[in-house]
Amino acid sequence: MIYRLARSVFFQLDAEKAHDLAIQNFSRFTGTPLDLFYRQHVPDRPVEVMGIKFKNPVGLAAGLDKNGECIDAFGAMGFGFVEVGTVTPRPQSGNEKPRLFRVLPAEGLINRFGFNNLGVDNLVENVKKSKYDGVIGINIGKNKDTPIEKGAEDYLICMDKVYEHAGYIAVNISSPNTPGLRSLQYGEALDDLLSQLKAKQEELAAKHGKYVPLALKIAPDLEDHEIVQIAESLIKNKIDGVIGTNTTLDRTLVKGMPHCDEMGGLSGRPLQNRSTEVIRRLAEELNGALPIIGVGGIDSAISAREKMNAGAQLVQIYSGFIYHGPKLVKDIVMNS
């Protein structure tokens, strides 16, 4: 009830202004009596994935808390893990506004943020301040002005800085809003990137005396042979996990709806079936070699269960959280 009232107010605002205001308030309210508006008890449902123990299998997807400002607030909502970022080596402002749009009839969102963030050093400081006792994933990307052929350097810089503070590291090569980024998902470019990341992981594990898993985040807009190729590269390079999927460029299910023609990645309910199908095909090709984190259009316990039945061991929410609030976390944990 409280969230429905808050949502009715926030949805009167520009989508990005509402997002920024929510982040500011979460940051301000945590640890005060006002956090009772979103704090809830979610029963433990432990699961071990990538060698990590998670309190429950429901996580916050990257993109909502880009700079790690509200980790403790999301922890209070009962998330079993929180993925912050995407973060880049240097701060960047992202694409021009407006760049976030609600597709209300479809419970979808279209964004073309472009990795706006305050830089990896700022995020690390926020992670260090957090009192959250769950798993913190850190999602890393490349700066827009870094040439794609030098993109690996940005990922390695971020890995070096976040490694000690991350529960796992997510490698984002699938955002549609950074020019050329998705080209890193294919063929030799992917193999080359993954081999460099694996070598850096081994180096940092020896240096810090702990092993931090690597997970690759992929797009939904893939042909079947591309899914097969990605699975082969993941196994070959001994990557620890895969996150499926990011946002889609496909507009088939939202044609004619408000904002449907805006440039950017579409998330929410219209992505639900496609992301589940990618997970199913990945699971077939991986055959248990590494775990899958399922994300894309999860807005209920049933849609979370569909991802898990398709092969996901963990799930993440973003757009579903915007439309349904913290209650969705508890619903999924208790009923999926």
Curated annotation (Swiss-Prot):
Q: In which pathway does it act?
A: Pyrimidine metabolism; UMP biosynthesis via de novo pathway; orotate from (S)-dihydroorotate (quinone route): step 1/1
Going by the record, the broad EC class of this enzyme is oxidoreductase
Q: Which UniProt keywords apply?
A: Cell membrane, Flavoprotein, FMN, Membrane, Oxidoreductase, Pyrimidine biosynthesis
Stated EC number for the protein is: 1.3.5.2
The alphabetized list of GO BP terms reads: 'de novo' pyrimidine nucleobase biosynthetic process; 'de novo' UMP biosynthetic process
Q: According to its UniProt record, which reaction does this protein catalyse?
A: (S)-dihydroorotate + a quinone = orotate + a quinol
User: In which residues is substrate bound?
Assistant: K66, N111, R112, F113, G114, F115, N172, N177, N246, T247
What cofactor does this chain's UniProt record say it requires? FMN
Q: Which Pfam families does the entry link to?
A: DHO_dh
Active site residues according to the UniProt entry: S175
Locations listed in the record: Cell membrane
- Cofactor annotation remark: Binds 1 FMN per subunit.
Q: Which CDD domains match?
A: DHOD_2_like
The Gene Ontology CC terms held by the record are: cytoplasm; plasma membrane
Task: Give the way it sits in the membrane.
Answer: Peripheral membrane protein
Binding, FMN: A62, G63, L64, D65, K66, T86, N139, N172, K217, T245, G268, G297, Y318, S319
**Does the record's keyword annotation contain Oxidoreductase?**
yes
Recorded GO terms, molecular function?
A: dihydroorotate dehydrogenase (quinone) activity
Q: Which PROSITE patterns match?
A: DHODEHASE_1, DHODEHASE_2
Family, similarity comment: Belongs to the dihydroorotate dehydrogenase family. Type 2 subfamily.
Give the function comment from the record.
Answer: Catalyzes the conversion of dihydroorotate to orotate with quinone as electron acceptor.
Which HAMAP family does the record cross-reference, listed alphabetically?
DHO_dh_type2 (MF_00225)
| Assembly mode | Monomer.
- Name the record gives this protein: Dihydroorotate dehydrogenase (quinone)
Species in which this protein is naturally found = Photobacterium profundum (strain SS9)
